[in-house]
Regions:
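Non-heme di-metal
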Residues: 1-158
Length: 158
């Protein structure tokens, strides 16, 4: 993979994490029964976004402008029906699947110097998919998110 292609993929992934951080924070309001899940997911997105931000700095790549982050987040929020939890889960699952594969590929083909951050990116996306699968099956997925954070010795406020 050429460096230009690699850094563009990093930039896009970072953009997604910024959107996810805000989106999940707002979804805690839309789905009050799942507020803790979404607040914790927002922390995960922030953690991953910060790790990718470090890579963007290393490669001297400018992140996507905040206005685009806010614009996409608002657009995504407008499409969410707060009374359709299961519908949202199924839609989100379909959105996640290609990213799981993309981040697996990025981890496999990325520079060895970036493997810590790329593993975090890959593993968090897999965790999100597992969370969604548990919720679709009628199980509580919060423990999966919490275990993920604990595996990185996260000590922030929850």
């Amino acid at each position: 993979m050429k460096i230009e292609e690699y850094t563009e993929k990093l930039r896009e992934a970072h953009f997604g994490e910024l959107v996810g951080e805000i989106l999940f924070r707002e979804m805690a309001i839309l789905f009050p029964d799942k507020a803790q899940d979404f607040q914790t997911l927002s922390i995960v997105e922030q953690l991953v976004g910060n790790a990718l931000g470090e890579l963007l700095e290393r490669y001297q790549v400018r992140p996507v402008e905040n206005a685009r982050v806010i614009e996409l987040t608002r657009h995504l929020l407008a499409d969410i029906q707060p009374d359709d939890w299961n519908g949202w889960l199924h839609q989100f699952r379909e959105v996640l699947k290609p990213f799981v594969q993309e981040f697996d590929d990025l981890y496999i083909h990325g520079p060895s110097s970036d493997l810590v951050q790329l593993r975090l990116l890959r593993d968090h996306e897999r965790m999100l998919l597992y969370y969604v699968d548990l919720e679709i099956a009628g199980h509580d997925g919060l423990s999966v998110i919490q275990s993920f954070l604990e595996s990185f010795n996260y000590r922030g406020e929850k």
